[in-house]
Amino acid sequence: MNRNDKQAYDRGTSLFSPDGRIYQVEYAREAVKRGAPVLGVRTADGVVLAALRSTPSELMEAESIEKLHKLDDALGAATAGHVADARKLVDFARTTAQREHLRYGEPIGVETLTKTITDNIQESTQSGGTRPYGASLLIGGVENGSGRLFATDPSGTPQEWKAVAIGGHREDVQAALEDGYAEDLSLEDGLALAVEALVAADEEIESDELNLVTVSEAGYEIVDEETIAELFADATADDESDETDEREE
């Protein structure tokens, strides 16, 4: 396909190219890749969500960057990509969860909420005068006593995962998750794995750049800075030990 032919399909959000692609959706995925990495880990006790909170300047308040969000008492989300788009999706998710709680007197299911969100995302790929959301979400929660973890895509596709990373350095973070994941992980093990995976992707990060939450039957809980510092120290110590072993070999 030559340049002029591509441009004919490049401007519309609801047009397929002859080779079956929607270019605006692909551009939205690129926006997600430009964001700082976030990840989720499903454990035997619930779900861990973690994010790297990087700032473009030392003068910017890191606390102003929100990437982990409480949706309901036992539901949380992590976001990557275009911040304003992510905020709109988080607001939509919260409203949906609250409406379901008020209507039926019980929390919305993790899968039900995810599919409602992705239905909303998918509509933006079929309507003229709109553009796809340049953000992806990880939705984690507890359903029927078990943790569940889903990821959304700018195309509106939901996927369930045991452990997954989105955003920048995704391949490196995902590889670390695959190396360390086990079905019987506890929440504490999941927190350790989350920090190890983010450290593996960027060895220059500091502990105060990390945010972690757990979502379990106890609810949505923010991990305190002291615990994060301990997890970070353990992860970096393990990394240094591995490098020493490699040099000795």
Swiss-Prot record:
Task: Give the organism the record lists.
Answer: Haloferax volcanii (strain ATCC 29605 / DSM 3757 / JCM 8879 / NBRC 14742 / NCIMB 2012 / VKM B-1768 / DS2) (Halobacterium volcanii)
User: What does the UniProt keyword field contain?
Assistant: Acetylation, Cytoplasm, Proteasome
Gene3D superfamilies in alphabetical order: Glutamine Phosphoribosylpyrophosphate, subunit 1, domain 1
Q: What is this protein's function per UniProt?
A: Component of the proteasome core, a large protease complex with broad specificity involved in protein degradation. The H.volcanii alpha1-beta-alpha2 proteasome is able to cleave oligopeptides after Tyr and thus displays chymotrypsin-like activity.
Which GO biological process entries does UniProt record here? proteasomal protein catabolic process; ubiquitin-dependent protein catabolic process
Location in the cell: Cytoplasm
- What are the inducing conditions? Up-regulated at mRNA and protein levels during transition from exponential to stationary phase.
Q: Name one GO cellular component term.
A: proteasome core complex, alpha-subunit complex
As one GO molecular function, the record gives:
threonine-type endopeptidase activity
Q: Which residues carry this modification: N-acetylmethionine?
A: M1
| Organism placement in taxonomy | Archaea, Methanobacteriati, Methanobacteriota, Stenosarchaea group, Halobacteria
Q: Provide the protein name.
A: Proteasome subunit alpha 2
Q: Phenotype when inactivated?
A: Strains lacking psmA2 gene alone display relatively normal growth rate and overall cell yield. However, depletion of psmA1 and psmA2 together renders the cells inviable.
Subunit description: The 20S proteasome core is composed of 14 alpha and 14 beta subunits that assemble into four stacked heptameric rings, resulting in a barrel-shaped structure. The two inner rings, each composed of seven catalytic beta subunits, are sandwiched by two outer rings, each composed of seven alpha subunits. H.volcanii produces at least 2 types of 20S proteasomes: an alpha1-beta proteasome and a proteasome containing all three subunits (alpha1, alpha2, and beta) that appears to be asymmetrical with homo-oligomeric alpha1 and alpha2 rings positioned on separate ends.
